[in-house]
Amino acid sequence: RECAVQGANVVLGARSLQKLQLIVGDIRSKGGEATYCAVDVTKPEECRNLIDTAVGEYGGVDVLICNAGLSMRALFDDVDLEVLHRLMDVNFWGTVYCTKYALPYLQASHGSLVGISSVAGLHGLPGRTGYSASKYAMTGFLETVRIENLKKGLHVMVACPGFTASNVRFSALTADGSSQGETPRDEAKMMTPEQVARIVIRGIEKRKRLCLMEAEGRATHFIKKFAPGFLDRMFYMVMVREPDSPLK
């Protein structure tokens, strides 16, 4: 929605056809231009179809925002390995597939490739091994794509929101792969998706490499450089105080 407000032609991709139709309808009712494509980002052929839809509708791709995400909340001791595979499939491979098919168009437009990572992609979060690993993988992948395209005018940005009041928190996987269904944190104290979207758009406009949000993201990035052991202890204490923390 925020991109459409800025005048962009928007192509949305997600698994829920009903939600896609509602959002696109809302954008169009307000004078924006948008279309959609149902896509499961764990399937490369569906990611290709998403990019083909964008090119067919609007002639190319200027910005690709890889925002599909899945989280978890369980100790590595307890978690089923299939949960970790699922997280990598969505968070990492979904980014790889969409980038692969969009890259020629982004190179042609000197456009922007954006990965929505996390504070968990800056420093490991206890109880989120698979999530942190997938976000670190995303970051390493995007940084390498940036370097490979230094002479081609491609902008690559890694955006790292903190805790955000979004559906990803309710769909976070537990040790056995079931959704946790509720969040242990106070949603009212978190950033809203709309706030995150506005910050990401500003980052794209400024062609930033790394887009940190809120004090926690900036502090994590800074403290890790000078006191990583302290940061380990701080993250441990934050997580152990969560209601029903798996660390207890």
Model-identified regions with their sequence ranges:
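SDR active-site lid
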Residues: 151-215
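Residue(s) in the substrate-gating loop at a strand-loop-helix junction
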Residues: 118
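Substrate-binding pocket helix/loop in short-chain dehydrogenase/reductase
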Residues: 75-76, 80-85
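Active-site-adjacent segment of SDR/Rossmann-fold oxidoreductases
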Residues: 123, 144-155
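Active-site helix of classical SDR
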Residues: 99, 134
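Conserved glycine-rich Rossmann-like NAD(P)H-binding loop of the short-chain dehydrogenase/reductase
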Residues: 8-22
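The beta1-alpha1 cofactor-binding region of Rossmann-like NAD(H)/NADP(H)-dependent oxidoreductases
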Residues: 17, 38-49, 81
